[in-house]
């Protein structure tokens, strides 16, 4: 049930915009679109029953003539309606079948001329003509144009990749501004900016693309760039010129990929300045000349090495490029969730009496727009002739409530002459302001299978009541007389790990971790194994769980329920008082848990609270008494503390913030949230799970060098880590980033000095998390020549895997099979060599690995036979399993994060407003970024172009003064109402509210508490970095747009 920590994906979030020029029309010409085949990965058949059929669309040349917008309106149409922080991106799930696209729009051939601005105000994109009738009127009269260039052919792509003239990359879009996208090239530490809709060339979030880099002279300066001198403490004598020279002399940067388990929900922001903005009168050399010069110095090298050398020589430059081909379309194209722009279409129809009839007669040449909930996706065109009958009928009857219905669509075509992709509706969920439709949409969008288990997968399950077969009793070590207990959340039903401890002579302890032996029930290549591999992981929502395995297995015969005989995989360590492992034993066992403790129960025992056996404590089973349980928990707590201290001394890193926990009523509806942090009992369990995972990784990687499933976490991004170092130095904090251990020690010293400011500690941890990325599963055979890359940076260990949660993670089952094979190989080897059982059984799984035995003819044969029997996969198959499990794990995390946001939104909607304190994390002339510690989230507050508000930014002192204007602004310009940036109350209202709160204080009203806690500020308000200011949170969207959480300044004024 536990993992080491929670994974954190830190995205680059960067803004951009586009400026266009009209071109002369070129009539009666159609382009020949070069297509690039999609690279199909090995996939499994979808079990979610999603309809993959596609309505065939007729040629829509006439429709294109009437409805294609001209380029003057593209800027507004490209941006999403509402900008909000989306979840971490997920690579396309390879476990779902692809759907072929059918062309719906023609693509006339016209030249492209659309250039991008650099980082416009995202709020300018919040409302576009697509939300009213103007867009439809403009589309009607637009002419056919070729907006995008044709994609390169497959031969051209292959040739360019071989010559190093183009690069294959993963396409990611900025959630704050869709005009900015970033491409990750494997082996390159800096992402490539793809600035503008034309340069993105119809690529969609998650696509695998081929990009061509712009000349070096067009690369803009990287905002937020920190030189080495800036990262040094004040008082150093090294001048900036020397530091810059050192930076240019570097020829490579370490590549980083991931972070095991972070806790921040926030994302970093590195904003580029647009392709044209980096040009100076003395431009740097061209990219080609730099590549040639670098190769002359270094000899033969790959295109990636050349690019890394250039980036190292020009660390202040942001590389830019353009997409020339989409080689693998993201499967998220098939599950885009959003709302139909019904009101805009109705307004368009009503603007012309000839079109306004009731009921309307809908033409197949017309369409309605779909506004995606995720701002990383473009608006979609849904032609009427592919609309479901129910939606079409409601449109004909001008049903305005249709706009509140949450729908899913799939992209079927995006021609060179269309500003938007063409889509068709695949699912209707319900009203966007209700919980259940939103949850179903989240699951659908992340391709989480919530259907019943197939009948075939259930046939291999044992019948209940189930007892341990006699042959298993004979084969396994019987530990039913051992005091074994479980510690889990109070609501847990899938108990897959248990603990035990025994005191040994000489001050030693024998600690046991016992994991449910799921591989006994889930055999390789069975229907149950196929379904478990397809689901890959259990998905935990707030009030329910979507299991990877059928409940009969995960909650009954496989779960380590108290008082029941259960099959387990056990690891027993003999430890001294310093936490050193003296000896170990690994094997398959039979256990019987004596009790199921919650984390709170275990914490009460650790804290020494009396009468632990009373007041609703769990029942005891077997011959054990509560004194046995309390002694075991206390001993385990002491040992885990020793192990934890030793792990951090060895360089482990721990970044953790508190997070809100939701309170639900009897109907399962959230009504409030409270802050919760982990207890000592959580760390107790975590420490032994980490030790078990590290032990399993060591055993299987030694026994099966080319076919072990491990989990790696490379070092963090060097540039971002240096930015964090510079940030700390600027604010008088010494940070050592030379290793994970030094980073941990530095953070502990800094936070020790800030122990009275827990909010700033949270902010510091957020900054520290941003250079980190996701850890990932991998097959050792893929990195057999790069063993140094197997390590785990955050845990500071050379080998790590997942072994302890086989009821909810498929990789753990794979690891169990490899471990079972290693045990079987030991038995086979001992029989062949006719050695003593104790000696033979320790050769592959003992504390000392017998390399000579493993490399002998008998050893190789034993390992091979055991691998075949237990289903240890080959390198090729295991690589596919690792990649797919990475995708599914990330999808499950995205579901969890989206549900957290959904429940927060729902509680705020009920409260209407939520006053709270916020800490300013970022400050400028247009907006500030604030951190709300109660929710653990960051939000932006924009204050420029607000009617009645004056925001003076003092650059010299980095100070913002916000004041109220008592007269209207002169001149022309668009200004938004004050209520969008400020929640303004009268001092009289505050006094009345406080009096009311005091009068009902005995009722413990939540409203009374919130009003009592935070008081509004008054004008003028002076704000600096890290200032604490009052804000009001509120729910945004639902029936009328994507869900978001808005923040405004909380101010008081008589006027």
Swiss-Prot record:
Q: Name one GO molecular function term.
A: metal ion binding
What are the CSD2 domain coordinates in residue numbering?
Answer: 367-446
* Cysteine disulfide partners in this protein: none
Query: Where does this protein come from, organism-wise?
Result: Arabidopsis thaliana
Q: What is its main location?
A: cytoplasm
The similarity comment for this entry is: Belongs to the RNR ribonuclease family. DIS3L2 subfamily.
Residues where Mg(2+) binds: 488, 497
User: According to the UniProt entry, which residue ranges have a biased composition of type Basic and acidic residues?
Assistant: 39-59
Q: Where's the RNB domain?
A: 476-824
Which Gene Ontology CC terms are recorded? P-body
| Keyword Ribonucleoprotein attributed | no
Q: Which InterPro entries match?
A: Dis3_CSD2, DIS3L2, NA-bd_OB-fold, RNase_II/R, RNase_II/R_CS, RNR_Ribonuclease
State the superkingdom. Answer: Eukaryota
Per its record, how is this protein called by name? Answer: Inactive exonuclease DIS3L2
Please give the function described in this protein's UniProt entry. Answer: Probable inactive 3'-5'-exoribonuclease. Is unable to complement the growth defect of a yeast mutant lacking RRP44 exonuclease.
């Amino acid at each position: 049930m536990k993992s080491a920590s929670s994974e954190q994906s830190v995205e680059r979030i960067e803004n951009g915009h586009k400026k266009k020029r009209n071109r002369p029309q070129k009539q009666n010409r159609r382009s020949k679109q070069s297509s690039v085949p999609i690279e199909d990965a090995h996939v499994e058949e979808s079990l979610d029953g999603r309809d993959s059929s596609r309505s065939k669309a007729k040629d829509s040349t006439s429709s294109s003539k009437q409805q294609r917008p001209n380029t003057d309106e593209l800027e507004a149409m490209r941006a999403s309606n509402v900008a909000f922080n989306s979840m971490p991106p997920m690579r396309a799930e390879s476990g779902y079948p692809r759907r072929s696209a059918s062309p719906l729009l023609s693509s006339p051939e016209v030249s492209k001329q659309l250039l991008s601005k650099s980082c416009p105000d995202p709020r300018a994109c919040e409302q576009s003509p697509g939300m009213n009738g103007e867009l439809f009127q403009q589309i009607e009269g637009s002419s056919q144009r070729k907006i995008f260039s044709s994609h390169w052919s497959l031969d051209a792509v292959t040739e360019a990749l071989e010559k190093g003239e183009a690069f294959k990359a993963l396409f990611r879009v900025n959630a704050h501004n869709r005009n900015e996208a970033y491409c990750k090239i494997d082996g390159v530490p800096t992402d490539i900016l793809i600035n503008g809709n034309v340069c993105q060339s119809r690529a969609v979030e998650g696509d695998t693309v081929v990009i061509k880099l712009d000349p070096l002279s067009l690369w803009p300066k990287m905002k937020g760039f920190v030189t080495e001198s800036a990262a040094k403490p004040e008082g150093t004598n090294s001048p900036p010129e020397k530091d810059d020279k050192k930076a240019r002399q570097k020829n490579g940067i370490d590549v980083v990929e991931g972070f095991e388990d972070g806790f921040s929900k926030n994302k970093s922001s590195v904003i580029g300045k647009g392709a044209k903005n980096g040009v100076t009168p003395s431009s740097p050399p061209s990219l080609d000349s730099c590549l040639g010069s670098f190769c002359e110095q270094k000899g033969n090298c790959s295109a990636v090495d050349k690019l890394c050398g250039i980036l190292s020589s020009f660390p202040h430059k942001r590389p830019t490029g353009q997409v020339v081909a989409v080689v693998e379309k993201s499967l998220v194209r098939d599950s885009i969730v959003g709302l139909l722009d019904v009101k805009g279409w109705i307004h368009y129809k009503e603007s012309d009496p000839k079109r306004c009839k009731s009921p309307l007669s809908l033409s197949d040449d017309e369409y309605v727009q779909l506004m995606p909930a995720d701002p990383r996706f473009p608006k979609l065109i849904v032609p009427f002739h592919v609309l479901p009958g129910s939606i079409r009928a409601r449109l004909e009857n001008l049903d305005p409530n249709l706009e509140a219905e949450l729908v899913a669509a799939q992209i079927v075509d995006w021609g060179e002459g269309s500003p938007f992709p063409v889509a068709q509706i695949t699912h209707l969920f319900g009203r966007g302001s209700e919980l259940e439709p939103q949850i179903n949409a989240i699951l659908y969008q992340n391709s989480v299978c919530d259907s019943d288990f197939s009948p075939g997968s259930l046939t291999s399950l044992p019948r209940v009541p189930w007892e341990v077969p006699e042959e298993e009793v004979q084969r396994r070590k019987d530990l039913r007389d051992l005091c074994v207990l479980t510690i889990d959340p109070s609501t847990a039903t899938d108990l897959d790990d248990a603990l035990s401890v025994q005191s040994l002579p000489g001050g030693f302890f024998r600690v046991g971790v016992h994991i449910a032996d799921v591989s006994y029930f889930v055999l390789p290549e069975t229907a149950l194994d196929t379904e478990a591999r397809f689901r890959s992981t259990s998905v935990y929502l707030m009030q329910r769980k979507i299991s990877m395995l059928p409940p009969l297995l995960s909650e009954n015969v496989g779960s380590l329920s108290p008082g029941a005989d259960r099959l387990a995989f056990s690891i027993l360590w003999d430890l001294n008082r310093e936490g050193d492992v003296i000896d170990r034993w690994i094997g398959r066992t039979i256990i019987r848990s004596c009790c199921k403790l919650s984390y709170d129960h275990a914490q009460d025992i650790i804290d020494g609270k009396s009468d632990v056996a009373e007041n609703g404590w769990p029942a005891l089973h077997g011959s054990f008494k509560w004194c046995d349980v309390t002694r075991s928990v206390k001993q385990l707590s002491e040992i885990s503390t020793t192990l934890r201290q030793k792990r951090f001394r060895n360089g482990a890193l721990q970044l953790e913030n508190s997070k809100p926990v939701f309170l639900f009523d009897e109907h399962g509806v959230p009504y409030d949230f409270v802050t919760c942090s982990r207890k000592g009992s959580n760390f107790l369990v975590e420490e032994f799970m980490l030790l078990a995972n590290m032990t399993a990784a060591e055993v299987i990687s030694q026994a099966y060098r080319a076919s072990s499933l491990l989990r790696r976490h490379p070092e963090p991004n060097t540039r971002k880590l240096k930015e964090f170092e510079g940030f700390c130095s600027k604010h008088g904090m010494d940070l050592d980033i030379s290793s994970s251990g030094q980073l941990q020690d530095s953070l502990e010293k800094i936070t020790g000095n800030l122990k009275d400011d827990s909010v700033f500690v949270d902010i510091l941890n957020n900054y520290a998390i941003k250079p980190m990325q996701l850890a990932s599963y991998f097959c050792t055979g893929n990195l057999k020549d790069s063993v140094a890359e197997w390590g785990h940076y955050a845990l500071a260990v050379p080998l790590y895997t997942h072994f302890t949660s086989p009821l909810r993670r498929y990789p753990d089952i794979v690891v169990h099979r490899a471990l079972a094979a290693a045990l079987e190989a030991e038995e086979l080897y001992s029989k062949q060599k006719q050695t003593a059982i104790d000696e033979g059984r320790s050769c592959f799984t003992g504390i000392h690995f017998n390399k000579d035995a493993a490399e002998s003819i008998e050893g190789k044969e034993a390992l091979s036979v055991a691998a075949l029997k237990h289903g240890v996969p080959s390198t090729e198959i295991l690589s596919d399993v690792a990649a797919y499990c990475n995708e599914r794990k990330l999808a499950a995390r995205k579901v969890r994060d989206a549900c957290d946001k959904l429940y927060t939104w729902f509680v705020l909607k009920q409260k209407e407003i939520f006053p709270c304190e916020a800490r300013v994390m970022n400050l400028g002339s247009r907006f500030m970024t604030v951190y709300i510690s109660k929710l653990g989230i960051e939000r932006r507050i924009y204050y420029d172009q607000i009617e009645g508000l004056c925001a003076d930014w003092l650059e010299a002192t980095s100070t913002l003064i916000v004041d109220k204007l008592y007269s209207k602004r002169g001149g022309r310009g668009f200004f938004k109402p004050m209520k969008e940036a400020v929640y303004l109350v009268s001092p009289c209202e505050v006094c009345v509210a406080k009096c009311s709160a005091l009068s009902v204080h005995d009722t413990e009203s939540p409203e009374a508490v919130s009003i009592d806690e935070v008081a509004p500020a008054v004008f003028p308000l002076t704000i600096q970095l890290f200032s604490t200011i009052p804000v009001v949170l509120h729910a945004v969207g639902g029936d009328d747009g994507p869900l978001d959480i808005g923040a405004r300044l909380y101010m008081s004024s008589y006027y």
